[in-house]
Amino acid sequence: MSESAERKSILDVVGIQELLPHRPPFLLVDRVVEFEAHRRLVALKGVTMNEPFFQGHFPAQPVMPGVLILEALAQAAALLATMSLKPDEVKDKITYLMGIDGARFRRPVVPGDRLELEVEVTKQKGAVWKQTGVARVDGQVVAEAEFMAMLADRER
């Protein structure tokens, strides 16, 4: 998967914003490059010095907060769920994160890194999805966790 620079987008940021409610600066997925319905998805996030969190974490030695790496994985997991269903099944739906287990951080993510976010479905029952997520930079694991999320009706 180190050839991610050459991979074509399956879904760009405009398409992502049609499926996720997140918007900059909290939208943490730039594009989807691999997708197998109900199985797996790979997305990318370019980490730049312009990210607002680097102003305070940490000014002299900027490091992406681990919780935001998990959020990026959770957004990729939400995309996997919504892209796996028919458009009429996800219309007026939103994915809510229900839990995170086994989160581990292996190395810092710094400006200039490109996060590769890989999520896989481990179980799905009705509207509830369980998935594993692994974030990599240059092929090295930087974070991993298990996620549970639910597709629910959007409140109006």
From Swiss-Prot:
Protein's recorded name: 3-hydroxyacyl-[acyl-carrier-protein] dehydratase FabZ
Keyword Magnesium: no
Family statement drawn from the similarity comment of this UniProt entry: Belongs to the thioester dehydratase family. FabZ subfamily.
Top-level EC class as recorded in UniProt: lyase
This protein's UniProt keywords: Cytoplasm, Lipid A biosynthesis, Lipid biosynthesis, Lipid metabolism, Lyase
EC annotation from Swiss-Prot or TrEMBL: 4.2.1.59
Gene3D superfamilies: Hotdog Thioesterase (3.10.129.10)
GN (gene name): fabZ
Major site of localization recorded for this protein: cytoplasm
Role description: Involved in unsaturated fatty acids biosynthesis. Catalyzes the dehydration of short chain beta-hydroxyacyl-ACPs and long chain saturated and unsaturated beta-hydroxyacyl-ACPs.
Active site: 57
Organism: Anaeromyxobacter dehalogenans (strain 2CP-C)
Keyword Lipid metabolism assigned: yes
Gene Ontology BP terms: fatty acid biosynthetic process; lipid A biosynthetic process
